[in-house]
Amino acid sequence: RNFLLKFEAAQIYYTQCYDNQSRASRKHQANVRMARLYISHFIQVLNLAVLRDEIKPVHKELYGLPEANVVPDLLSEASLVEWGRKIIDGEQRRISQGGIPIYNPTIARVKVHYDIFLDSYERQKGYQSATNRSLDELASMRDRADELILDIWNQVEAKFQGINPNETRLEKCRDYGLVYYYRSNEKVKEESELSC
């Protein structure tokens, strides 16, 4: 009885964790899209400013960007975290050295969307961690649950093993909650016996 309460509580907790993670994921994906859009756009504007000779190519080193005018891969959330930080820090260093700020988008606007994404990213990692821990806890209880189910099953069948015919015995066991499923080859055998 005590195990059943713990198992049900673990099942409920896992479901809650999974639901929380799923709900937060929708909002998080919107934050990912906005951060990716602003970081990518800022890098494109920076590259165009370099092409127009408004910013020296050597200044791209402040951002950790290669001299080639390409946008780094921003598909993964980890790369967004990395490049967002590099772009924000690089722009602040360039401005502190006397450079003119890039507009449309401004680094302040990029930073706002990056910070929102970063908060959401950390929160989502927390939800994922809680879901994984709760699933591990539930999985660790499965063997004990299976043992209890098998023990109950065997006790119920042992109690009614002397009852004949077989269908009456199975009906008594069903009254105790046992559920029988016919295997595909058993169904064919039973149907062929009925047709004879």
What are these model-derived regions, one by one?
Residues 1-196:
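Basic/polar low-complexity intrinsically disordered segments
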